[in-house]
Amino acid sequence: MLEKIKENLFLLLIALFMVGSIGIYIFSANQYKVNSLTSGDKDVIASIDKLKIYADNLYKDKLDSDTLYWQYRTAVINESQETTKEIKSSAKKMTNNIDSYYRQQNPNDENYVALRKQLSTFGFTGENAINDYAITVKKETELNKKYITKHYDKLVKNVEKKSPKSIYLIFLQQEETPAKENTKAYVNKLIKKNGFKDTAEKYASVTANLGLTNNKGLYGYTDKDEESNDFTQKSSTIPGEIVKQVMEMKKGESFDEWTSVTDSSGNTYFVKAYVDETNIKKMLNSDDETVVDKTISSFVNNNNTLSSDILDHYASKLEITYKDKKAKKEITKYLKEMRKNAKEMEEQSNEQGNEQATEQAN
């Protein structure tokens, strides 16, 4: 779990690093139009949720297309989705996980200090800095889900090809003299008596410590793309050999026998998996955030233009006024280039799929 947090933080810093100064107003079309804003004695050239960009900072840094794009994207997200109680709650959990990780290490950890400093640079200050960004992340998830749901039949085809499943895991660490309750025979009896899911929850501490599951033993979404996973203590990803077996299973099925896997540090585990769900629509609407998030990611990853389509869709519903002509030009150019690249990737993917189908037919 901690490694997942570290990876997310790395992405968080990358994204935040690209959020810079830009002269742009974005607000809902049905709201009043704002011509100018001030905060104290400074002119505000952008007001996006709680983030304010001041005019005297506008030209401190070189106008960069990546910077402009991420500012544009952040603005569209924040103005397109209201901050619901559910989003606040989910963002708070994300914030607490990040804070907990660093405070377990060192409250003065240089990475944590760097994160707070970077957040401050972009206007996210005080105790709520990380939470404000987390809210933006959760808003984007909600917008993606709405769009995918509306266009589900068209988008699901590429996801179906990956045979997605939601699974539970039980890991037993190999020991010379394991306690009775940690033996394969004992756990087999529990599975037969109480069912796989209840037993997985009882032994979830092992998989949770490996960063693989929640405290109920739920790993969540997996598909063919994870068949090549390496198993390391730092990867927080299910071993590829387990995924390969899961891909051959149906809903309600579990491993008949225990599978032995060894991580990169030489630790060996006995593993069993259970397929809880194969219905993609149900996974998209799961009560578990991890299942939903990974399902959404699969839709985005397997439909190359989807990210651009979603952004364009919500941006079209907003009133966008650029105070800086160069900014408008750079953003427009960036968006066109991004869509062009996405279409090229989609064409290449389709060609590869056709070639594979031809090979299999022959």
Question: Residue locations for each model-derived region?
Answer:
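C-terminal soluble interaction/assembly domains
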Residues: 259-262, 269-293
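Soluble non-cytosolic domains of exported or imported proteins
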Residues: 60-75, 85-93, 109, 128-138, ...
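Solvent-exposed, polar/charged alpha-helical surfaces in well-ordered, non-transmembrane soluble domains
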Residues: 70, 74-79, 92, 96, ...
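Extracytoplasmic
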Residues: 40-43, 48, 163-169, 266, ...
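Short, low-structural-confidence N-terminal segments
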Residues: 1-69, 317, 321-362
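Acidic/polar surface patches and capping/hinge elements
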Residues: 39, 138-170, 178-185
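Peptidyl-prolyl cis-trans isomerase
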Residues: 186-244
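N-terminal targeting/tethering segments
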Residues: 31-132
